[in-house]
Amino acid sequence: LPAGGVLFDTLNFNTDGIPGVNTLIIEANPIDTITFQYDQAEQYHFNNIAHLRFLIQDDRENPMLDVTFDGLHILDGDVVSARPEILVNLDDENTTLLLDSPGDTIHFKVFLTDPSNVTRRIYFRDGALDIMQFTPANGPSNISKIMYRPVFAQDGNYTLTVQASDISRNQSGDNDYKVSFEVINKPTITEVLNYPNPFTTSTRFVFTLTGQQPPTYMKIQIMTVSGRVVREIDMSELGPVRVGRNISEFAWDGTDQFGDKLARGVYLYH
């Protein structure tokens, strides 16, 4: 470097695991540790050394955990499919420490308590068999996912517990995610009602389905007290249905099959 010259350089280094105040020491024309000679002779060397203090912010934010059954958030005690699709999402605000490695499965623990009250951990693999599928974060967001597709052959009440943390070991919350649910393998439709009842403008239908999958055929008939069918509502009108509790997207407005307003009074449905 000639007298009065300037040299610009860029140094990249990993700051993982060193949160807090750090010091970067930079030395120009350092001594050769083998020959104990400088590359260039200088009258003074003390001004060739710089100490730069810098702060690395510690990651203390908790990641957000989200669990859905067949695309929906369930409540304690809900009925679910005997073959549900359980999706676990872990969303971390830190986009520099991505959960982007297959080895990041160590940041998840999933437990299942069966109707016999036996709790066991669910691992990602059982020998050569994949039990849960892990999708790493791929940026720019830091969202990793677990897909779990169990088969619940035994009827009864289950409890799912999920623990998760980010790269910095921040837990997803003070408490584990825990939800209890019921499985009934036999296909049934129960707890059918309409709400509100009575109604003035429209009413929706509420019902609970059990089994492994939603029915392929379903119809609601509305009749007079004498048994005459005045309105039929098929699945295309009802909207999406699933195993578990349902409330129809369709709202009946008190009209017959031709759109004519029915007389006030009591009607039956099945």
Q: What kind of region is each of these model predictions?
A:
Residues 108-110, 162, 219-221, 252, ...:
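Generic short beta-strand
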